[in-house]
């Protein structure tokens, strides 16, 4: 089960998109060729990047657009990888998808990256990388959550009660309403679920960067 985020200063969360991949009513891309494979299989969204140098992404549009405050969270399991590479979430881009935001973790090391970049990687507008500790060493299951609340992004991994990174919304400008998964060469993953929720903050929230306390975490596992 996906972990719930800390709820300090949050009055209500309203689910606007949720998929457990029991079917493909949502219309995720399905494909199989010499470069990639993507399919709904055994209540998971399976994604394989067979190339040696080209990243892949699998995405859809949030029909009514992202609200002012929102959270995206997902559970992803890495099945195999060759060499090094990253996988995770992409969001905030349009159909031409020239510029994207991503929140990804490394396949071979306990590291993560948050960045805004051009599709061809010729230019990176914002980038931050850091390390983290898995709650269960050796586990192949990864829990990622990204939240935008009153102009600040918060990024969570696994059971951390505190975000691994915080930045102002201006660093990760949104170009559109598409979101989905990112997979680099040689990596095979499957997603168990993904959820997007609208967040309503409590009256009087002062909009400053908020650092949640450990006691405010609700573990949804």
Feature annotation, model-predicted:
Residues 2-32, 202-220:
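Extracellular carbohydrate-recognition regions
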Residues 120-145:
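Short, aromatic/His-centered strand-loop micro-motif at the edge of beta-sheets
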Residues 36-56:
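Short carbohydrate-recognition loop motifs
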Residues 21, 191-199:
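Extracellular beta-strand elements of beta-rich domains used
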Residues 21, 74, 136-169:
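Carbohydrate-binding surfaces in secreted/extracellular proteins
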Residues 165-192:
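Flexible glycan-contacting loops in extracellular carbohydrate-active proteins
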Residues 49-119:
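Secretory/extracellular carbohydrate-interaction modules
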Residues 6, 57-65, 129-136, 168-169, ...:
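Beta-strand-rich interaction surfaces with strong enrichment in secreted/lumenal proteins
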